[in-house]
From Swiss-Prot:
InterPro entries: EF-G-like_DII (IPR053905), IF2_II (IPR044145), IF2_N (IPR006847), P-loop_NTPase (IPR027417), Small_GTP-bd (IPR005225), T_Tr_GTP-bd_dom (IPR000795), TF_IF2_bacterial-like (IPR000178), TIF_IF2 (IPR015760)
Protein name: Translation initiation factor IF-2
Stretches for region G2: 532-536
Residue numbers spanned by region Disordered: 36-392
Record gene name: infB
Organism: Corynebacterium glutamicum (strain R)
Molecular-function annotations in GO: GTP binding; GTPase activity; translation initiation factor activity
Amino acid sequence: MPGKLRVHELAKQLGITSKELLATLKDKGEFVKTASSTIEPPVVKRMQEHYGSSGSDKSDTAAKPAAAKPAAPKPAASAAPKPGAPAKPAAPAAKPAPAAASAAKPGAAPKPGVQAKPAAAAKPGAPAKPAAPSAAKPGSAPKPAAAAKPAFSGPTPGDAAKKAEPAAKPGAEAPRPDGMPRPMGKPAPKPGARAPRVANNPFSTGGGERPAPRPGGGPRPGGGPRPGGGPRPQGQGRPGGQRDGQRDGQRDGQGNRGGQRQGAGAGGPRPQGGPRPQGGSRPQGGSAQGGSAKGAQGAPSQERQGGGRRPSPAMMPPTPGQMPAKAPGKGGRGGQAGGGAGGGFNRGGGTGGGAGRGGRRGGTAGAFGRPGGAPRRGRKSKRQKRNEYESMQAPNVIGGVRLPDGKGATIRLARGASLADFADKIGADAAALVQALFNLGEMVTATASVSDETLQLLGEEMNYKVQVVSPEDEDRELLESFDLQFGEDEGGEADLAKRPPVVTVMGHVDHGKTRLLDTIRKANVGSDEAGGITQGIGAYQVKVNVEDTERTITFLDTPGHEAFTAMRARGAKSTDIAVLVVAADDGVMPQTVEAINHAKAADVPIVVAVNKIDKPEASPEKIRGQLTEYGLIPEEYGGDTIFVDISAKQGLNIDELLASVCLTADAELDLVANPEMDAQGVAIEAHLDRGRGPVATVIVQRGTLRVGDSIVAGDTYGRVRRMVDEYGRDVEEAGPSRPVQVQGLNGVPGAGDNLLVVEDDRIARQIANQRNARKRNALAARSRKRVSLEDLDSVLKEHSTLNLILKGDNAGSVEALEEALLKIEMDDEVQLNIIDRGVGAVTQTNVTLAAASDAVIIAFNVRAEGKATEEANAEGVDVRYYTIIYRAIEEVEAALKGMLKPIYEERVIGHAEIRAIFKASSVGLIAGCMVEDGKVRRNATVRITRDGNVIAENAKIVSLRREKDDATEVSAGYECGMVLSYPDISVDDKIEVYEMVEVPREA
C-alpha cells in the first residue's frame, strides 16, 4: 500500500507552491502544519479536484501529441508498450537487429529476449501507449518495432501479439501527458487518467517529476540497444536493466503476470538506482543495494527506453499465487508460461514466462520507494483512517492542554466522581484534566471528589454533556448489574395477597401522638421517653376490632420536634396512610404544616385526628378552618378528608378513628403484595446494642423475610441471625407490612435504607461495598469547599473550627442531630466540622480521635464505655452527654459564638489642642497642649487633624508630662506636654484621644 502524499509532493504535482497549497488547505478547514506533513487520500482527492481545471488543461496539451503519434505507427505501438525493453530483447530474438545484440552485454541477450516478450505483452494499456510516441519519433524506432513483433510471439505465437495490441490501444485513448517528451528530455508524468503514485519518493509523485533524468541524452530509439555496453544518459548508477527486466516480466504471453514487480507493486521496497544526473533516482533501478551484478546480467537488454512513468501499484492487479519475495536479494517467482528464467538480484524465480520479480532489497527506507524493513501485512481500516483524519482537525485546547472533543456526547458520572473517573469515561489523561481545570481557576487533584458544578464546567469546555446521576438512579443501575430490582412485586395477579395498612402518626411536638398509640396498644411508651418527646421512630403492629372484624394495622410513631424533619419525611415515604394529630387547644403549628407537606409529597392519604377535645379551651371547629387553608377540607364542608375528634388521654372515639383508617385503606388503596418472593423492605430505624450488636427495625414491604436470609441494607450486609417483634418475641419469618427487629448485619444501616434479600453473601457484600464507596465520595464532595485561585488567600487564613464527634443511640437520632447542627448559621470565620459520627457508646477509639483532632464528643442518649472515660480525662477530651436534642443544639451554638473573634468599637476619651512646640535633642518635638475635654492618657491612640483634615491616624502618645513630672493621664482644663509618634505636627493641630473597647455580640 503506497504511503501518504506529503504537502510539497502534492504541490509539485499540481504545479503550485507549497505555501499556496497550505493556504488552500487552511481555507478548506484542513489542519496541516508544514509542507512536510502528510495528507490523507480524501484530502488529496479534494485538492486535485480543486485544481483540476488548471491541471486538465496542461494534461490535454501534452496528451494530444501523445495520442496522435502512436496512432500512425501501429507496430511501434505494440512494440513500445515498454519502449526500450521490447526493442532490446527483440534484437537477440529476431536476427534483423544485430546492432541490438552487439549493444547488449555478452551472454545476457538470450535471457532478456525471452523475458522481454511477456514484458511487452504485459505492459498495461494506459502506460504503454504514451511510451509509443517516444519510440516512434526517432528514425530507428520502426525497425525495432518490426523486430519486436516476433519477440511478442515468442512464448505464445500469435495470441500474445493479438492480446498485446488491444492492451496497448487503451493507452492511446488515455494518453500519458509526458509520453511524448520522454525522448526530448521532458518530464514523464503518469497517465493523466490515473492518480499519481503515492510513495515516499518526492520525485515520483507527479507527471512532471521525471523530466530531468533524461537530459542531453536525446531520444532513445525504441529499438536501440540497452546501455549494457554504452552509457545510459540518465541511469549512470544503474547497472543493466534491472528495472525493466522486472517490468518486462510483468505478464507472460498469455497476458498473465510473469514476475512480481520489484517494488511498489508487491508491497516491498525497491532497490535504489544509482545517482541520477538531475537528482531523480529511478526507484527500481538495479543498483547493488539488495542485489548484485547478477541482476544486471540477468536482464541487460530490458531497460526501457521510453520516457513514460511506469504504472503505480494500484494499476497492476496481483496475480494469484505470486506473493512478494521475502528474503532480500532473491529472485522473484517466474512467469506462468515458457520463457527465460526470472530476472532478479539473484537467480530467477522460475523457468516460466516473464522475468521473476527481484527480491526485496536490504531496505532503503525514506524518500526512495517504500519504507525498508519487514513488509507490513495489515492495512488500516476505513474507521482508522477516518479517526486519524479527524484527529488532524483543529484540536480542543484549554490553556495549552490538548483535550478530546466530545462533539456533544453525553457522559454519565456519579455524584462525587473524581477527575480520574471522568478521564476513564472519555479516554483522556487525568493529569491533563487537572491542568485544564487549574487553567480554568479550579484547584482539584485527580483522585479527589469533584462537585457537580465543576464536572459540568469541565464537560462544557470539552463539548461533553455531563450528566450527574442521582443516587436513586445510580442505585437502580447497581442493582440491575446484579439482575436485581427493588420496588416491584414479582409474579402475576394470582400471586398477590392482601396486606395490612402501614399507618404513620405525624404532627407537632406535644400534640399527643405517642399517647394516642399508647391508648391503641394499651401500653405506656411516652412516660419512658426523655423530656416527654419522641426522638425516634417506633413501629408497632396491633390487632383491632373494626365493625366486629379483627384487623391488623401497623403503626409508625414519628417525632414532632423540628430537628427530626428527615425522620418525618422517611416515615411518610414508608407508609400507606398518614394520621395527622392536631391539638384542639393549640392549633396548627410549624411541624403540623411540615407533616402535611411530607404526606402530600409522598402522595399519602391523610386522616386528621383532632386531639385533646376534653380540654375546656379546645376548639375543633377552629382546627378545621385552619387546615382548610392547607388543602385539607373536611367531609362536612364538602371535601374528602376525614376528621375525627378524639381524646387520647380519655380514650374517646379511638374506635371511630381506627374505623376511618380501615375505610380509607379499603376505599382508596389496593394493598396487596406477593408473600412468596424474596423479601424487600425498609429500615426505618437502627441502633447499636451492646449485647446484640447492630439492630435494625425493618418493615417488610413485599415478600417474606426469614431467618438465615442473606440481606443487604444500604451499605451494610449480613445474614439474618434473629428476628424479634415489637414485644420482644422471636419470630421465624415476617410477611408484608410486618415490623421486626433484625440482627446479623455487619454494621448499623442508615435510617430509611432499603433492605433486600439476595442470593448469597458474596453478592450482598459486593453491593454493600459499592454503595459504601459511593457514599464516601458523595460525602467528600459535599463537605469539600470549592477553592479557586481568587479566594486562595482567604482560605489559607486561619479560621476557628469546632470539630465534633457525634455518638447516638440510633441512626435516626444521629442523623437528625447532625442536620440540626449543620443548620446553625455562623460567620465565615467560624466553621463547624463533624469529623466522625456513629451509633453506640463512646469508645476509646472515639476519644483517641478527639484528642488527635482537638474535637468535642457529643454523646446523645449513650455513655462512655470501659476505659473511655479515664482516657478522656487523661487526654483532656471534652465529652458532653445529652438526652434531649435541642439542648445539644443550643450548647453547640453557644460554643460556636464563643469562638468568634471579639468585636471592638472606637470610644473617644478626650480632645486636646497644640498651643506650642518645643524641641529637645533627646526626644525630638514636644507638643505643649491644652486638654479641652475628657482625658489624655499615656500610650493612648490619637488622631491628629489640621484644618479639619486628618493628617495622622493611629498615632501614639509616647510620653506625657504635667509640668516637669511624668503623668499617666491629664484631665480637661490642664496643660501638658506630650511626645507623639507622629513627628510632623504644628501649632493649632487638634488631637483626638480614643481607645478600642470590646462590645458583646448580639444574640
